[in-house]
């Protein structure tokens, strides 16, 4: 059996940098406001995995009303969810992540993001794609108010 999952996340800028995205700390004058570390890429990816196994969303498993998750490392959340994916008998086929941000520039960090995600999902880096785009200065991302990310995953039954 093959399953697909889709995830989406948004965080607004605020406070001190760096911005953590795809498991990588990117120098920037502001950080992202969040209960956890605010890693929009990993949050979208985590939601995609949860969606693929019909297990709800990240907020259900790691609620922002629970102080246990305050400042949580999103790489640990992703690994926890991938453990659940494997427990249900699935393995990752591939993951594709799109980051929508006017700033900071993502291109210099994409390879490191792919490597971190591949490590966390126990897969070859060739199964992970991360790309970034601006919104041509349109909308909240274009005004540099925040960052949005979408992710899709393909899972195969083992």
Swiss-Prot record:
Pathway: Isoprenoid biosynthesis; isopentenyl diphosphate biosynthesis via DXP pathway; isopentenyl diphosphate from 1-deoxy-D-xylulose 5-phosphate: step 4/6. Binds 1 divalent metal cation per subunit. It catalyses: 4-CDP-2-C-methyl-D-erythritol 2-phosphate = 2-C-methyl-D-erythritol 2,4-cyclic diphosphate + CMP. The record marks 35, 134 as: Transition state stabilizer. It comes from the Bacteria. It is an enzyme of class 4 (lyase). Its cofactor is a divalent metal cation. 4-CDP-2-C-methyl-D-erythritol 2-phosphate binds at residues 9-11, 35-36, 57-59, 62-66, 101-107, 133-136, 140, 143. A divalent metal cation binds at residues 9, 11, 43. PROSITE patterns: ISPF. InterPro entries: MECDP_synthase, MECDP_synthase_CS, MECDP_synthase_sf. The keyword Magnesium does not apply. Keywords: Isoprene biosynthesis, Lyase, Metal-binding. One of its GO terms (biological process) is isopentenyl diphosphate biosynthetic process, methylerythritol 4-phosphate pathway. It holds the Pfam family YgbB. Its EC number is 4.6.1.12. One of its GO terms (molecular function) is metal ion binding. Belongs to the IspF family. Involved in the biosynthesis of isopentenyl diphosphate (IPP) and dimethylallyl diphosphate (DMAPP), two major building blocks of isoprenoid compounds. Catalyzes the conversion of 4-diphosphocytidyl-2-C-methyl-D-erythritol 2-phosphate (CDP-ME2P) to 2-C-methyl-D-erythritol 2,4-cyclodiphosphate (ME-CPP) with a corresponding release of cytidine 5-monophosphate (CMP). Homotrimer. This is 2-C-methyl-D-erythritol 2,4-cyclodiphosphate synthase.
